[in-house]
Amino acid sequence: MRTVHDDELKKILKIMSPGTSLREGLDNILRAKTGGLIVLGDNEEILDLVDGGFNINSEYSPAYIYELAKMDGALVLTSDRKRILYANAQLMPNQSISTFETGTRHRTAQRVAKQTNKIAIAISQRRNIITVYKGDIKYVLRDSAVILSKANQAIQTLEKYVAVLERVTNNLNILEFQDLATLFDVTTAIQRTEMVMRIVEEIEGYIIELGNEGRLISMQLNELVRSIEQDGVLLIRDYCYDKMEYNDVYKEIQELSAEDLLDLDIIAKELGYVGKSLIDTLVSPRGYRISSKIPRIPSNVIENLVGHFGKLKYILEAGNEELDQVEGIGEARARAIKNGLRRIREQVALNKNL
């Protein structure tokens, strides 16, 4: 499970991504070049800041806020964005709240957002941009064409990184079946997996911001990454030191800086190998990752299998009778495991992706 970064910002972007009725209204105001100030919130704290204006209390529609924004004052919408409460209102936030904005709308929006921790949107009349504030967050919404271009570039980069990861993983697969994997091979595979996942995170941010215009990017992303994260977690589980919790190790690796991620010794240290030579240290996998590739074998059976034998090499050496002794594995399943591992070994020998 990936650590969630910028979760609050992602929630904000989801609310006003292309395809939503709020974004349609914002774009209408932007095209009309009238400018506007919109606050999303209907609690007492917001309503206490409202001075004057018209109490509309009408159902929200993009056309309504486009027309109402022609007046100078602010619009106040309910938090669920279903109703327009006030139009042409003057907002009176605490003037002592610091702001580095210059325009009146933007200064008011930032102060309201900081004071109430609600979303305030300022639409610039001259610069033709939409700026969103909430608490200490400030974000300028970008044009969909710009984001789409960045997302396509990121997809191309991801394709190259996935190709490298596949080569590294194929090499590790061969070595695992021969029980010749070194710490260097393992840390390289973990490093490459994390690099891929960081690009995936970036693309997911673009997809949220693109809204319904990001469907094709989303499909391309799903096609490229498939089970990469799951394989990466199982890889850590295969090789981390016995008393270490693999999910904690995964979180630590996610927290590494871009510079630290390039240092394989640091990744080895996170796995519990301190002061070991990467190239000279042979390591044996427990077998979670390879066993997960066997068709129609439930995860609880894989847990029992690895728990019983301890290492992949012992699972590979085991006969049907030995496999049959494991809880949850009968005669039929023992044959399925043996045949599954044999087919995986053949695929690996042919240098095919699992």
Swiss-Prot record:
<dbReference type="InterPro" id="IPR018906">
    <property type="entry name" value="DNA_integrity_scan_DisA_link"/>
</dbReference>
<keyword id="KW-0234">DNA repair</keyword>
<dbReference type="InterPro" id="IPR003390">
    <property type="entry name" value="DNA_integrity_scan_DisA_N"/>
</dbReference>
<dbReference type="InterPro" id="IPR010994">
    <property type="entry name" value="RuvA_2-like"/>
</dbReference>
<feature type="binding site">
    <location>
        <position position="73"/>
    </location>
    <ligand>
        <name>ATP</name>
    </ligand>
</feature>
<keyword id="KW-0067">ATP-binding</keyword>
<dbReference type="Pfam" id="PF02457">
    <property type="entry name" value="DAC"/>
</dbReference>
<keyword id="KW-0238">DNA-binding</keyword>
<dbReference type="GO" id="GO:0003677">
    <property type="term" value="F:DNA binding"/>
</dbReference>
<keyword id="KW-0460">Magnesium</keyword>
<dbReference type="InterPro" id="IPR036888">
    <property type="entry name" value="DNA_integrity_DisA_N_sf"/>
</dbReference>
<feature type="domain" description="DAC">
    <location>
        <begin position="6"/>
        <end position="144"/>
    </location>
</feature>
<comment type="function">
    <text>Participates in a DNA-damage check-point that is active prior to asymmetric division when DNA is damaged. DisA forms globular foci that rapidly scan along the chromosomes during sporulation, searching for lesions. When a lesion is present, DisA pauses at the lesion site. This triggers a cellular response that culminates in a temporary block in sporulation initiation.</text>
</comment>
<comment type="subunit">
    <text>Homooctamer.</text>
</comment>
<dbReference type="GO" id="GO:0006281">
    <property type="term" value="P:DNA repair"/>
</dbReference>
<dbReference type="Pfam" id="PF10635">
    <property type="entry name" value="DisA-linker"/>
</dbReference>
<protein>
    <recommendedName>
        <fullName>DNA integrity scanning protein DisA</fullName>
        <ecNumber>2.7.7.85</ecNumber>
    </recommendedName>
</protein>
<dbReference type="InterPro" id="IPR038331">
    <property type="entry name" value="DisA_sf"/>
</dbReference>
<keyword id="KW-0808">Transferase</keyword>
<feature type="binding site">
    <location>
        <begin position="104"/>
        <end position="108"/>
    </location>
    <ligand>
        <name>ATP</name>
    </ligand>
</feature>
<comment type="similarity">
    <text>Belongs to the DisA family.</text>
</comment>
<keyword id="KW-0548">Nucleotidyltransferase</keyword>
<feature type="binding site">
    <location>
        <position position="91"/>
    </location>
    <ligand>
        <name>ATP</name>
    </ligand>
</feature>
<dbReference type="GO" id="GO:0106408">
    <property type="term" value="F:diadenylate cyclase activity"/>
</dbReference>
<keyword id="KW-0227">DNA damage</keyword>
<dbReference type="GO" id="GO:0005524">
    <property type="term" value="F:ATP binding"/>
</dbReference>
<dbReference type="GO" id="GO:0004016">
    <property type="term" value="F:adenylate cyclase activity"/>
</dbReference>
<comment type="function">
    <text>Also has diadenylate cyclase activity, catalyzing the condensation of 2 ATP molecules into cyclic di-AMP (c-di-AMP). c-di-AMP acts as a signaling molecule that couples DNA integrity with progression of sporulation. The rise in c-di-AMP level generated by DisA while scanning the chromosome, operates as a positive signal that advances sporulation; upon encountering a lesion, the DisA focus arrests at the damaged site and halts c-di-AMP synthesis.</text>
</comment>
<dbReference type="InterPro" id="IPR023763">
    <property type="entry name" value="DNA_integrity_scanning_protein"/>
</dbReference>
<dbReference type="InterPro" id="IPR050338">
    <property type="entry name" value="DisA"/>
</dbReference>
<keyword id="KW-0547">Nucleotide-binding</keyword>
